A protein has these predicted regions:
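Catalytic cores of DNA base-excision repair glycosylases
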Residues: 6-228, 236
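Short, small-residue-biased leader/transition segments that mark boundaries at the very start
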Residues: 1-2
Protein backbone atom coordinates (compact mmCIF):
# COMPACT_ATOMS: atom_id res chain seq x y z
CA UNK A 1 0.00 0.00 0.00
CA UNK A 2 2.83 2.40 0.80
CA UNK A 3 4.30 1.86 -2.65
CA UNK A 4 1.01 1.82 -4.55
CA UNK A 5 0.02 5.15 -3.03
CA UNK A 6 3.39 6.72 -3.76
CA UNK A 7 3.38 8.03 -0.21
CA UNK A 8 7.07 7.53 0.53
CA UNK A 9 8.25 9.04 -2.75
CA UNK A 10 6.28 12.20 -1.95
CA UNK A 11 6.77 12.53 1.80
CA UNK A 12 10.21 11.07 2.53
CA UNK A 13 12.48 13.57 4.24
CA UNK A 14 15.61 14.61 2.39
CA UNK A 15 18.17 13.34 4.88
CA UNK A 16 21.88 13.28 3.96
CA UNK A 17 22.44 9.71 5.12
CA UNK A 18 19.78 8.59 2.62
CA UNK A 19 21.72 10.05 -0.29
CA UNK A 20 23.21 7.52 -2.73
CA UNK A 21 26.51 9.35 -2.22
CA UNK A 22 26.56 8.68 1.53
CA UNK A 23 29.25 6.23 2.57
CA UNK A 24 28.50 3.14 4.69
CA UNK A 25 30.42 4.89 7.46
CA UNK A 26 28.07 7.86 7.21
CA UNK A 27 25.08 5.53 7.48
CA UNK A 28 26.60 3.80 10.51
CA UNK A 29 27.28 7.11 12.25
CA UNK A 30 23.71 8.26 11.59
CA UNK A 31 22.22 5.08 13.04
CA UNK A 32 24.23 5.41 16.25
CA UNK A 33 23.38 9.10 16.61
CA UNK A 34 19.68 8.54 15.94
CA UNK A 35 19.33 6.11 18.83
CA UNK A 36 17.07 8.00 21.25
CA UNK A 37 17.93 11.38 19.68
CA UNK A 38 15.61 13.31 17.30
CA UNK A 39 16.63 13.90 13.68
CA UNK A 40 16.61 17.68 14.12
CA UNK A 41 19.35 17.44 16.75
CA UNK A 42 21.33 14.81 14.89
CA UNK A 43 21.57 16.62 11.53
CA UNK A 44 24.09 19.35 12.45
CA UNK A 45 26.20 16.99 14.58
CA UNK A 46 26.25 14.34 11.85
CA UNK A 47 27.49 16.84 9.27
CA UNK A 48 30.17 18.15 11.62
CA UNK A 49 31.21 14.62 12.55
CA UNK A 50 31.62 13.50 8.92
CA UNK A 51 33.57 16.62 8.05
CA UNK A 52 35.93 16.02 10.94
CA UNK A 53 36.15 12.22 10.78
CA UNK A 54 35.05 11.15 7.28
CA UNK A 55 36.33 7.58 7.68
CA UNK A 56 36.57 5.01 10.48
CA UNK A 57 40.35 5.40 10.40
CA UNK A 58 40.03 9.11 11.18
CA UNK A 59 37.85 8.51 14.22
CA UNK A 60 39.93 5.56 15.40
CA UNK A 61 42.96 7.77 16.13
CA UNK A 62 41.07 10.81 17.44
CA UNK A 63 41.62 11.87 21.07
CA UNK A 64 38.72 10.58 23.15
CA UNK A 65 38.21 14.01 24.72
CA UNK A 66 37.68 15.49 21.25
CA UNK A 67 35.20 12.75 20.40
CA UNK A 68 33.12 13.45 23.51
CA UNK A 69 33.21 17.20 22.91
CA UNK A 70 32.06 16.75 19.32
CA UNK A 71 29.23 14.53 20.51
CA UNK A 72 28.16 17.53 22.57
CA UNK A 73 24.55 17.39 23.78
CA UNK A 74 23.26 14.48 21.71
CA UNK A 75 22.87 12.62 25.00
CA UNK A 76 24.05 9.21 26.09
CA UNK A 77 27.75 10.03 25.48
CA UNK A 78 28.66 6.39 25.93
CA UNK A 79 27.45 5.98 22.35
CA UNK A 80 30.34 8.17 21.20
CA UNK A 81 32.83 5.94 22.98
CA UNK A 82 31.30 2.80 21.51
CA UNK A 83 31.32 4.36 18.06
CA UNK A 84 35.02 5.04 18.38
CA UNK A 85 35.55 1.46 19.53
CA UNK A 86 33.61 0.28 16.48
CA UNK A 87 35.77 2.47 14.24
CA UNK A 88 38.92 0.91 15.68
CA UNK A 89 37.47 -2.56 15.12
CA UNK A 90 36.63 -1.69 11.51
CA UNK A 91 40.22 -0.59 10.99
CA UNK A 92 41.68 -3.62 12.73
CA UNK A 93 39.39 -6.30 11.32
CA UNK A 94 38.18 -4.96 7.98
CA UNK A 95 40.98 -2.78 6.62
CA UNK A 96 39.07 0.39 7.50
CA UNK A 97 35.95 -0.48 5.51
CA UNK A 98 32.57 -0.92 7.16
CA UNK A 99 31.58 -4.56 6.49
CA UNK A 100 28.43 -5.39 4.59
CA UNK A 101 27.84 -8.76 6.23
CA UNK A 102 25.25 -8.44 9.02
CA UNK A 103 27.10 -10.94 11.21
CA UNK A 104 30.33 -8.95 10.87
CA UNK A 105 28.44 -5.77 11.71
CA UNK A 106 26.92 -7.34 14.82
CA UNK A 107 30.40 -8.33 15.95
CA UNK A 108 31.48 -4.67 16.11
CA UNK A 109 31.43 -2.98 19.55
CA UNK A 110 28.12 -1.31 20.31
CA UNK A 111 26.34 -2.67 17.22
CA UNK A 112 23.21 -4.66 17.96
CA UNK A 113 20.66 -6.47 15.82
CA UNK A 114 18.82 -3.33 14.76
CA UNK A 115 21.87 -1.25 13.82
CA UNK A 116 23.46 -4.13 11.93
CA UNK A 117 20.27 -4.69 9.94
CA UNK A 118 19.86 -0.97 9.23
CA UNK A 119 23.43 -0.54 7.97
CA UNK A 120 23.22 -3.70 5.86
CA UNK A 121 19.94 -2.53 4.32
CA UNK A 122 20.50 1.20 3.87
CA UNK A 123 24.23 1.21 3.09
CA UNK A 124 24.60 -2.01 1.12
CA UNK A 125 21.13 -2.89 -0.19
CA UNK A 126 21.03 -6.20 1.68
CA UNK A 127 17.36 -6.99 2.43
CA UNK A 128 17.60 -7.32 6.20
CA UNK A 129 14.44 -6.71 8.22
CA UNK A 130 14.85 -3.38 10.03
CA UNK A 131 12.59 -3.05 13.07
CA UNK A 132 12.81 0.04 15.25
CA UNK A 133 10.25 1.67 17.53
CA UNK A 134 8.48 3.36 14.62
CA UNK A 135 8.21 0.14 12.62
CA UNK A 136 6.92 -1.75 15.65
CA UNK A 137 4.22 0.87 16.22
CA UNK A 138 3.05 0.87 12.58
CA UNK A 139 2.81 -2.91 12.48
CA UNK A 140 1.14 -3.10 15.91
CA UNK A 141 -1.60 -0.76 14.73
CA UNK A 142 -2.02 -1.70 11.09
CA UNK A 143 -1.80 -5.47 11.52
CA UNK A 144 -2.47 -6.37 15.17
CA UNK A 145 -4.94 -3.59 15.97
CA UNK A 146 -2.98 -2.53 19.04
CA UNK A 147 -2.40 1.11 19.97
CA UNK A 148 1.22 0.55 20.95
CA UNK A 149 3.62 -2.39 20.90
CA UNK A 150 4.99 -3.94 24.07
CA UNK A 151 8.11 -2.71 25.78
CA UNK A 152 10.43 -5.24 24.13
CA UNK A 153 10.64 -6.64 20.62
CA UNK A 154 9.30 -10.20 20.49
CA UNK A 155 10.04 -13.03 18.09
CA UNK A 156 6.44 -12.90 16.94
CA UNK A 157 6.83 -9.22 16.01
CA UNK A 158 10.03 -9.98 14.14
CA UNK A 159 8.39 -12.81 12.19
CA UNK A 160 5.47 -10.55 11.34
CA UNK A 161 7.79 -7.82 10.08
CA UNK A 162 9.75 -10.31 8.01
CA UNK A 163 6.56 -11.68 6.46
CA UNK A 164 5.45 -8.19 5.42
CA UNK A 165 8.65 -7.33 3.54
CA UNK A 166 8.53 -7.53 -0.27
CA UNK A 167 10.55 -10.36 -1.80
CA UNK A 168 12.37 -8.10 -4.25
CA UNK A 169 15.53 -6.81 -2.48
CA UNK A 170 15.25 -3.25 -3.80
CA UNK A 171 11.61 -3.00 -2.73
CA UNK A 172 12.42 -4.63 0.59
CA UNK A 173 14.98 -1.95 1.44
CA UNK A 174 12.61 0.80 0.32
CA UNK A 175 9.94 -0.83 2.48
CA UNK A 176 12.20 -0.59 5.52
CA UNK A 177 12.69 3.13 5.00
CA UNK A 178 9.04 3.78 4.15
CA UNK A 179 7.60 2.11 7.26
CA UNK A 180 10.13 3.87 9.49
CA UNK A 181 9.19 7.20 7.91
CA UNK A 182 5.47 6.53 8.27
CA UNK A 183 5.95 5.87 11.98
CA UNK A 184 8.08 8.98 12.43
CA UNK A 185 5.82 11.40 10.56
CA UNK A 186 2.25 10.06 10.62
CA UNK A 187 1.74 7.00 12.82
CA UNK A 188 3.28 8.70 15.84
CA UNK A 189 3.00 7.48 19.41
CA UNK A 190 0.84 10.45 20.42
CA UNK A 191 -1.76 12.11 18.20
CA UNK A 192 -1.29 9.97 15.06
CA UNK A 193 -2.50 11.65 11.87
CA UNK A 194 -4.74 8.83 10.69
CA UNK A 195 -6.48 11.15 8.23
CA UNK A 196 -3.18 11.43 6.33
CA UNK A 197 -2.14 7.80 6.60
CA UNK A 198 -1.96 5.68 3.43
CA UNK A 199 -2.78 2.60 5.51
CA UNK A 200 -5.88 4.02 7.21
CA UNK A 201 -8.40 2.15 5.04
CA UNK A 202 -6.92 -1.22 5.94
CA UNK A 203 -5.57 -0.45 9.42
CA UNK A 204 -6.79 -2.91 12.05
CA UNK A 205 -6.46 -0.31 14.81
CA UNK A 206 -8.59 2.25 12.96
CA UNK A 207 -11.15 -0.44 12.15
CA UNK A 208 -11.37 -1.26 15.86
CA UNK A 209 -12.14 2.36 16.71
CA UNK A 210 -8.59 3.35 17.67
CA UNK A 211 -8.72 1.94 21.22
CA UNK A 212 -6.29 3.42 23.77
CA UNK A 213 -3.19 1.51 24.78
CA UNK A 214 -3.55 -1.11 27.47
CA UNK A 215 -0.59 0.37 29.31
CA UNK A 216 0.18 4.09 29.06
CA UNK A 217 3.92 4.55 28.37
CA UNK A 218 5.86 6.57 30.91
CA UNK A 219 8.89 8.65 29.99
CA UNK A 220 12.08 8.39 32.00
CA UNK A 221 12.54 11.15 34.55
CA UNK A 222 15.28 13.65 33.70
CA UNK A 223 15.88 15.88 36.70
CA UNK A 224 18.42 14.45 39.08
CA UNK A 225 19.38 11.49 36.89
CA UNK A 226 22.90 10.48 35.93
CA UNK A 227 22.15 11.58 32.37
CA UNK A 228 21.34 15.11 33.52
CA UNK A 229 24.56 15.29 35.51
CA UNK A 230 26.67 13.96 32.63
CA UNK A 231 25.07 16.45 30.26
CA UNK A 232 25.83 19.33 32.61
CA UNK A 233 29.45 18.22 32.97
CA UNK A 234 29.96 17.93 29.22
CA UNK A 235 28.38 21.33 28.65
CA UNK A 236 30.62 23.01 31.22
Amino acid sequence: TLFRSGWFAVHARDLPWRSPDCSPWGVLVSEIMLQQTPVVRVLPRWREWLERWPTPADLAVAPTADVLTAWDRLGYPRRALRLQEAARAVVGRHDGRVPADPAALRALPGIGEYTAAAVASFAFGIPETVVDTNVRRVIARAVAGEALPGRSLTRAEMRRAQALMPEDPARANAWNAAVMELGALVCTARSPACDRCPLAETCAWVAAGSPPPVEVPRGQAWAGTDRQVRGAVMAA
